[in-house]
Amino acid sequence: MIQSQINRNIRLDLADAILLSKAKKDLSFAEIADGTGLAEAFVTAALLGQQALPADAARQVGAKLDLDEDAILLLQMIPLRGCIDDRIPTDPTMYRFYEMLQVYGTTLKALVHEKFGDGIISAINFKLDVKKVADPEGGERAVITLDGKYLPTKPF
């Protein structure tokens, strides 16, 4: 039976334990996700407490990380999503995303509405990908793809 969580702390505690096991085993998120049939970003989100894994994937991930049965069950439960503290992020990487939305949020909104009409981009029917590419000017660049289904506003 599908179960739901009402408290974010249990998944945050599990995420801490998962990250410790990941570090001890020297595994990447890609290695943990391998064989689950799910995207690296989705599995990572589940490991960090923001998604629920199907039972088979939870068992595969649990075996790689030596998680107990309770932890494997928790990975399958629908989490309390979006539970980052209600404040401006202080972590530099997360702050840059916040800053990007501060600078480009109105631009994204205007372009989405111009191209699609009144509506939203789903974070439920959604795909996320992060790639590292060479910068022709030297160094590296991050290419982040946010792929969400457009859901039009429906008058009623």
From Swiss-Prot:
One of its GO terms (molecular function) is DNA binding. Its EC number is 4.2.1.104. Coiled coil: none annotated. InterPro entries: Cyanase, Cyanate_lyase_C, Cyanate_lyase_C_sf, CYNS_N, Lambda_DNA-bd_dom_sf. It catalyses: cyanate + hydrogencarbonate + 3 H(+) = NH4(+) + 2 CO2. It comes from the Bacteria. SUPFAM superfamilies: Cyanase C-terminal domain, lambda repressor-like DNA-binding domains. It is an enzyme of class 4 (lyase). The active site is at R96, E99, S122. Keywords: Lyase. GO terms for biological process: cyanate metabolic process. Belongs to the cyanase family. Homodecamer composed of five homodimers. Catalyzes the reaction of cyanate with bicarbonate to produce ammonia and carbon dioxide. This is Cyanate hydratase. It comes from Escherichia coli O157:H7. The gene is cynS.
